[in-house]
Swiss-Prot record:
Mg(2+) 2 binds at residues 261, 263. Pathway: Cell wall biogenesis; peptidoglycan biosynthesis. The gene is ddl. This is D-alanine--D-alanine ligase. Keywords: ATP-binding, Cell shape, Cell wall biogenesis/degradation, Cytoplasm, Ligase, Magnesium, Manganese, Metal-binding, Nucleotide-binding, Peptidoglycan synthesis. Signal peptide: none annotated. Residues 95-294 form the ATP-grasp domain. GO terms for biological process: cell wall organization; peptidoglycan biosynthetic process; regulation of cell shape.
Length: 297
């Protein structure tokens, strides 16, 4: 049971790991918590483990590096493989791939540490409008996000995001509903609509606040739910996901769906969305954990 790790999302991973470990032990699995920060994962196989439930979040656990190590030692593991994990950690390249497949994403401008000096806020606002969303390409859990409401705020928002990553996305603001859709073994589960207390679903709303509201079913018409499920499955297949993943989707002001990002190791805490979605189709937390484990390759 891989949990903890070295990324900014270490604590979230511990919370997920605790819940999953409990569920596995309750069902008679011989499961042990392993924190890669404290233990050399290359020794897992020779220490007698025969599969890994990977609930690490963020860099070093969800970005293809851990997956590659587990492939090297020949240990089956849960979730996406090396390529899908590495690709989806990079929001910019994920969106470029989706765009190439003809799938809908927000309009964006990419800024790097090297190109920051040439950033022309006026030109960006002329192209994308206001407000804008500024975010690091690689950080998960909504770390480093800023909503920019005026052209003068853009540079400082990008500077702030550059503390977390070298590549920054400046995106058109999507004013419609925020949705997240879980996929389990190629089955698209019911969408969840997220209504944060603040202006957007940030770290506080995700992990701390009890005032964020979640609606599942999401209140979409059957036709819209079907349209969303088809879109999400195409997005999941395009990046090569397997086992389980959660895809975030926003609506623009006109209600058009826009793909946002993929979570290849979704959270599994009491606040988490994947278990909420599974529960609406009669899959208990314990059943979900076992199903994810059974899908490990």
């Amino acid at each position: 049971m891989l949990l903890g790790g070295t990324s900014a999302e270490r604590e979230v991973s511990f919370n997920s790991g605790k819940a999953v470990l409990e569920a596995l032990l309750k069902q008679g699995y011989n499961a042990h918590p392993i924190d890669p920060k404290e233990y050399n994962v290359a020794n897992l196989k020779k220490d007698g483990f025969n599969r890994a439930f990977n609930i690490l979040h963020g860099r070093g656990g969800e970005d293809g590096t851990m997956q590659g190590l587990l492939e090297q030692i020949g240990l089956p593991y849960t979730g996406c493989g090396v390529m899908a994990s590495a690709l989806t950690m990079d929001k910019m390249r994920t969106k470029m791939l989706w765009k190439a497949f003809g799938l809908p994403v927000a309009d964006m401008k990419v800024v790097t540490r090297e190109t920051f000096a040439e950033l022309d806020p006026q030109a960006v606002v002329a192209k994308l409008g206001l407000p804008l969303m500024v975010k690091p390409s690689l950080e998960g859990s909504s770390v480093g996000l800023t909503k920019v409401k005026a052209v003068e705020e853009l540079k400082s928002a990008v500077e702030y995001a550059l503390k977390f990553d070298n590549t920054i996305l400046i995106e058109e603001w999507l004013a419609g509903d925020e949705l997240t859709v879980s996929v389990l073994d190629n089955q698209v589960l019911p969408a969840i609509r997220i209504v944060p207390e603040g202006e957007f679903y940030d770290y506080e709303a995700k992990y701390i606040s009890d005032n964020t509201q979640y609606f599942c079913p999401a209140g979409l018409t059957p036709e819209r739910e079907q349209e969303l499920a088809i879109l999400v499955k195409r997005a999941y297949d395009a990046v090569g996901c397997r086992g389980w993943s959660r895809i975030d989707v926003m609506c623009d002001a006109k209600g058009n769906f826009r793909l946002v990002e993929v979570n290849t190791n979704p959270g599994m805490t009491s606040h988490s969305l994947f278990p909420k979605s599974a529960a609406t189709v009669g899959i208990s937390f314990e059943q979900l954990v076992v199903k994810i484990l059974e899908l490990s390759l």
